[in-house]
Amino acid sequence: MPRKNKYEAQLALINGENVNVGTKSELKDFVVLLGGLVGIVIIFLLSFNVVSDFFIDRMSTESQLKIESLFKGTQNKKIPDKYKQQIFLLENIKQKIIENDISIQGKSELNISVLEHKEINAMIKPDGSILFTTKLLDENFPEEELAFVLAHEIGHYSNKDHLKSISKQIAYAIICTIAGLDSKVNNIVQGVSEIEFLSHSKEKEKEADMYANKMLITIYGTNEGAKNFIKKLQNKDKLPEFVHYFSSHPSWNERLKLIENN
């Protein structure tokens, strides 16, 4: 068998057993690049959040109301007759909460309206209004339990979370725009951003729970409404505990322990 010259030997090296040498090098470079990209995204998000939260927390009432006015849409639909009594009750509870929190006095009217939805939920909108889903109202929770839900949403308003969530969306949009030229890079950025968002959101939910817990004790002298509401939803929730790791809210068990220990 004739001996291969050096060019044939190099070709055999490329096509033969040792071709994985270059693959290992490329894999190492990819891991380094990926780690650097993840690090940059995390640093950017943390820095952006710290800076934006700093200015939002110190925002004047006038500036806050101007920003909220930018998100005011069309007037909410008329409240159905079947929910009017509950909304009237919630409006009275709202006034008691405002009386006990100077930080929200003179700001949004915190208008309460009804949203047709099949899930038990409530939410604070960027304009400072609050939505209660029809499913939540259909459950006919007692006053103190409704008060906990309302106080939780007003807690978000007091902490200006409704504005901070906008800044998070802006940060995410900036990163996606920069990385948008490459779908693979964009997927990585999206994944890292969502993990950071979920972690940040869970902390905000705990703060809102603590606000609501304190408000119930102030108004009713007890936080039984908070504990009872959480227990009821905990019994309705059939998802395994670990699933809440991927949720924007802490698990019901975590929330109950937080309330019981404070």
Report residues per predicted region.
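A Zn2+-metalloprotease active-site environment signal
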Residues: P2-N262
